[in-house]
Amino acid sequence: MTIPQLDGLQIEVQQEGQGTRETRRGDNVDVHYKGVLTSGKKFDASYDRGEPLNFTVGQGQVIKGWDEGLLGMKIGEKRKLTIAPHLAYGNRAVGGIIPANSTLIFETELVGIKGVQKGE
């Protein structure tokens, strides 16, 4: 599997996915995630809401670290993404929860790719 190498993005595959179809730019995907600061403090988790996040990869709907770090995933795959500030929110604080210039750590799971069956 090809994993993009981008300065400021560390990708650790924690569980392999199924099938051969990998995510690419323009795919509409459903992703479950948990986000924590480097201190370990959780700031968000789709698991808590019981609904994965839906977005289109590579369209700037999410932080750049996600647009790049979720490329090449297969359905069911789990990745840990460690994202430097310049690929996250940079020098902006977010909602009083994420301080400016924060490195973010996400545990992600690709739940689905629109139009692709599990195992394809």
From Swiss-Prot:
Pfam families: FKBP_C. Residues 26-114 form the PPIase FKBP-type domain. One of its GO terms (molecular function) is peptidyl-prolyl cis-trans isomerase activity. Keywords: Cytoplasm, Isomerase, Rotamase. GO terms for biological process: chaperone-mediated protein folding. Belongs to the FKBP-type PPIase family. FKBP1 subfamily. This is FK506-binding protein 1A. It comes from Neurospora crassa (strain ATCC 24698 / 74-OR23-1A / CBS 708.71 / DSM 1257 / FGSC 987).
